[in-house]
Amino acid sequence: MKTKTLHQSVKLPASPHDVYEALMDSKKHAAFTGAAAKISPKKGGKFSTFDDYATGENLELVPDKKIVQSWRAADWPKGQYSVATFELKPAGKGTQLDFTQTDIPEEVYDDIAQGWVDWYWDKLKAYFK
């Protein structure tokens, strides 16, 4: 299966701590996305977001700085995982979030890329306004 890598960056009007918490706290994640989330805040812990559409495991967690997760969509072939990396850096009064996702199946790349914009970056901007 051919895969692709996605790179996106977004500036958010909140501290790296607040952005990290929104991504890693189940209640805050549900508040900004409007969808159920179960997220373990520990390395090796599992997560499930958007009513089990996206699932995976926390591979590396550096509070307020970095999140690395194995990540898969429910409709991907069994056993197919990507790796999603969120890097958070202070930027003025906000946060620069640099996002990379590797091993995305080529046939769903465009949908996944747009999904991060629609379901994460735009919603985080609105949440922190």
Feature locations, PLM:
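Hydrophobic ligand-binding cavity/cleft-lining segments
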Residues: 1-38
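Residues at secondary-structure transition points
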Residues: 14, 76-79, 83, 107, ...
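Hydrophobic-ligand binding "helix-grip"
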Residues: 30, 38, 48, 52-96, ...
